[in-house]
């Protein structure tokens, strides 16, 4: 099974390189900058986990930004949601509302790639199907 990387204004290709470098199959990369279209839910149902992300994770994420919507749809579909963000300003309760499994901070391509690698290692031990 594959992983879905759905990022808003972050470099999804860099995250994908990190995931692949750690040994995961090539992920399905979805550009969420313009919101979620009709294909998103079908793509979500075809993966074992989703990585959402945006430049800043905060209370506005819960109140309507696309990363919050990705997390809600993932929870509704029974798909674990992880986040890679530029800055994490969301309190633990907010993360629980979104049911985020991991939250990693990264800025720039090199850090995004490294975050992808760290997340892949966690996924391979936590949620990777046999």
Where are these regions (language model features)?
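N-terminal loops that bind phosphate or other acidic moieties
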Residues: 1-130
């Amino acid at each position: 099974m594959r992983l879905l990387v759905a990022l808003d204004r972050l470099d999804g290709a860099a995250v994908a390189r990190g995931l692949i470098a750690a040994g995961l199959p090539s992920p399905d990369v979805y550009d969420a900058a313009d919101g979620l279209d009709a294909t998103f839910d079908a793509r979500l149902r075809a993966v074992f986990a989703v990585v959402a992300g945006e430049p800043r994770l905060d209370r506005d994420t819960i109140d309507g930004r696309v990363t919050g919507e990705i997390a809600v749809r993932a929870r509704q579909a029974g798909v674990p949601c992880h986040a890679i963000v530029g800055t994490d300003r969301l309190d633990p309760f907010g993360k629980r509302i979104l049911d985020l499994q991991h939250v990693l901070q990264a800025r720039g391509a090199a850090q995004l790639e490294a975050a992808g690698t760290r997340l892949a290692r966690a996924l391979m031990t936590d949620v990777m199907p046999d």
